[in-house]
């Protein structure tokens, strides 16, 4: 139970290691991080008993940037037959669980195991319920079984309220056929990640206004229109006719980094390919000058020290807003639909309600 196991995007294992090591050092949890390149996972092995539990207790999962999912536990080697009996024996010292997720890594090997997991889950679930190890109670810990192979599994536990929203941190979003580009799924995932579902009507209402900077062809604009917002799309490139036909979109041929609205808007979204430091300046202007209430903005990460750069820019934003004496909540996550980038959500907390 003394290893913290984390899923991530393949190629970002080093970022997960850097991030969790920084948090562990700050909290005084001794150990070391490791992650095989392109494995889609990383671990923090704690040197002292209870270290992994303390990390998960002190940290909020939604404040971590690069991990998609986490669990504390250890590896179990399984026989070719009667895997369930071995797992039941291993779980004897674990708490009673309120839910069960079988997970695989986001790799070719992991995808090959997904069929096995679907078939294995039904008899395993029945056996756990019969043994009194699994009950229907969302308040109890979640059992997370990450299969590395059919014979090797990481048996982990996590709080259902302090871990990923979906198995492996991968949302099952359906691409809408009428959307102009697949980038639309990035913004839809951001809504789920950063805004509690019960607040959607209030914060993503059809009486709101939005701006999409670098909008062409309209993947992110589509999500705003889908919520019924009046949208100003800023881009020198063309917009999808289907969006223009809704009557909810005004397309202005302008530079997304220099254009500003005459009146404040509710939402600003931006997925422009640009150096992250320049995009950060854009965020500081829009939130700092009250041009929008909330924003979802992607920071592109072409550099090598990706976690260090993201951390530097987030700290810079926080210091900028503090110096201006304005209250802004800042969240950042590498979403499943992100590539070499992270998604930031910002919200002014000191503006009067609409």
Swiss-Prot record:
Q: Which GO terms describe its molecular function?
A: S-adenosylmethionine-dependent methyltransferase activity
Coiled-coil ranges (or none): none
Instruction: List locations, semicolon-separated.
Output: Cytoplasm
Where are the catalytic residues? Answer: 300 (proton acceptor)
Q: Which UniProt keywords apply?
A: Cytoplasm, Methyltransferase, rRNA processing, S-adenosyl-L-methionine, Transferase
E.C. designation(s): 2.1.1.186
Q: Which domain of life is it from?
A: Bacteria
Quote the protein name from its UniProt record.
Ribosomal RNA large subunit methyltransferase M
What is the documented function of this protein?
Catalyzes the 2'-O-methylation at nucleotide C2498 in 23S rRNA.
Q: What is an annotated GO biological process for this record, any one?
A: rRNA processing
SUPFAM superfamilies per UniProt: S-adenosyl-L-methionine-dependent methyltransferases (SSF53335)
Q: Which Pfam families match?
A: FtsJ, RlmM_FDX, RLMM_N
Species assigned in the record: Pseudomonas putida (strain ATCC 47054 / DSM 6125 / CFBP 8728 / NCIMB 11950 / KT2440)
Q: Which reaction does it catalyse?
A: cytidine(2498) in 23S rRNA + S-adenosyl-L-methionine = 2'-O-methylcytidine(2498) in 23S rRNA + S-adenosyl-L-homocysteine + H(+)
Organism classification: Bacteria, Pseudomonadati, Pseudomonadota, Gammaproteobacteria, Pseudomonadales
Which InterPro entries does the protein's record reference? RlmM_FDX, RlmM_THUMP-like, RNA_MeTrfase_FtsJ_dom, rRNA_MeTrfase_M, SAM-dependent_MTases_sf
What is known about its subunit structure?
A: Monomer.
* Disulfide topology: none
Family in the record:
Belongs to the class I-like SAM-binding methyltransferase superfamily. RNA methyltransferase RlmE family. RlmM subfamily.
- Note the PANTHER family from the entry: RIBOSOMAL RNA LARGE SUBUNIT METHYLTRANSFERASE M (PTHR37524), RIBOSOMAL RNA METHYLTRANSFERASE FTSJ DOMAIN-CONTAINING PROTEIN (PTHR37524:SF2)
Ligand binding (S-adenosyl-L-methionine): 183, 216-219, 235, 255, 271
One GO cellular component term, please give it: cytoplasm
Q: Does the keyword S-adenosyl-L-methionine apply?
A: yes
């Amino acid at each position: 139970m003394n290893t913290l196991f984390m899923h991530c995007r393949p190629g970002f294992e080093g970022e997960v290691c850097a991030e969790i090591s920084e948090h562990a050092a700050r909290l005084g949890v001794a150990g070391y991080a490791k992650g095989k390149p392109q494995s889609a996972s990383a671990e923090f092995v704690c040197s002292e008993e209870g270290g992994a539990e303390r990390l998960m207790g002190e940290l909020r999962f939604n404040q971590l940037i690069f991990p998609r999912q986490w669990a504390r536990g250890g590896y179990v080697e399984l026989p070719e037959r009667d895997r369930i009996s071995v797992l039941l024996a291993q779980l004897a010292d674990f708490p009673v669980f309120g839910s069960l997720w079988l997970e695989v890594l986001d790799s070719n090997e992991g995808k090959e195991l997904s069929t096995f997991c679907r078939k294995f889950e039904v008899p395993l679930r029945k056996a756990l319920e019969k043994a009194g190890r699994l009950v229907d109670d969302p308040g109890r810990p979640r059992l997370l079984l990450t299969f590395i192979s059919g014979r090797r599994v990481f048996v982990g536990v996590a709080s259902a309220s302090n871990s990923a929203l979906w198995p492996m941190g991968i949302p099952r979003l359906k691409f809408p056929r009428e959307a102009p580009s697949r980038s639309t799924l990035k913004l839809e995932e951001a809504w789920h990640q950063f805004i509690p579902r019960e607040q959607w009507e209030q914060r993503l209402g059809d009486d709101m206004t939005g701006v999409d900077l670098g909008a062409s062809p309209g993947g992110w604009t589509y999500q705003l229109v889908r919520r019924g917002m009046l949208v100003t799309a800023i881009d020198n490139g063309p917009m999808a006719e289907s969006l223009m036909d809704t009557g909810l979109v005004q397309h202005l041929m302008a530079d997304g980094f220099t254009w500003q609205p005459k009146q404040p808007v509710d939402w600003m979204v931006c997925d422009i390919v640009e150096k992250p430091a320049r995009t950060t300046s854009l965020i500081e202007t829009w939130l700092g000058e009250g041009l929008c209430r909330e924003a979802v903005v992607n920071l592109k990460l072409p550099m090598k020290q990706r976690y260090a750069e993201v951390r530097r820019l987030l700290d810079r934003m926080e210091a900028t807003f503090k110096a201006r004496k304005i209250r802004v909540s800042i969240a950042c996550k590498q979403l499943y639909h992100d590539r070499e980038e992270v998604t930031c959500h910002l919200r002014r907390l000191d503006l009067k309600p609409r």
